[in-house]
Amino acid sequence: MPTINQLVRQGRKPVKYKSAAPALEGNPQKRGVCVVVKTTTPKKPNSALRKIARVRLTNGTEVTAYIPGIGHNLQEHSVVLVRGGRVKDLPGVRYKIIRGALDAAGVANRKQARSRYGAKKPKK
């Protein structure tokens, strides 16, 4: 507990906010180019082949981004839009690729939560 005199001399230090997605530099999304597209296995209780991409953003930083949805058309040199948001069972994956934007096509035959996966409304 500081004294009044210490507060007058130094004041209170503001609490520094640490960004959850520092590579985006405060932007909601950022464009990038896929460097590697591969699959990885998740942490302990889960088992799958999760699709991820290593993306070089326009600011020069390289991040690992998750590719959501079933099936994708991404390959090396694909231009993608990246947003923040981690994948809990993949350590080090703190970004997601936005489906239906730039080179990332929307998920085919998607009926529910379509806007999240860039899918058009199906014909009756």
Curated annotation (Swiss-Prot):
The keyword DNA repair does not apply. Coiled coil: none annotated. It comes from the Bacteria. InterPro entries: NA-bd_OB-fold, Ribosomal_uS12, Ribosomal_uS12_bac. One of its GO terms (cellular component) is small ribosomal subunit. PROSITE patterns: RIBOSOMAL_S12 (PS00055). Keywords: Methylation, Ribonucleoprotein, Ribosomal protein, RNA-binding, rRNA-binding, tRNA-binding. The modification 3-methylthioaspartic acid is found at residue 89. Pfam families: Ribosom_S12_S23 (PF00164). GO terms for biological process: translation. GO terms for molecular function: rRNA binding; structural constituent of ribosome; tRNA binding. SUPFAM superfamilies: Nucleic acid-binding proteins (SSF50249). With S4 and S5 plays an important role in translational accuracy. Belongs to the universal ribosomal protein uS12 family. Part of the 30S ribosomal subunit. Contacts proteins S8 and S17. May interact with IF1 in the 30S initiation complex. This is Small ribosomal subunit protein uS12. It comes from Thermoanaerobacter pseudethanolicus (strain ATCC 33223 / 39E) (Clostridium thermohydrosulfuricum).
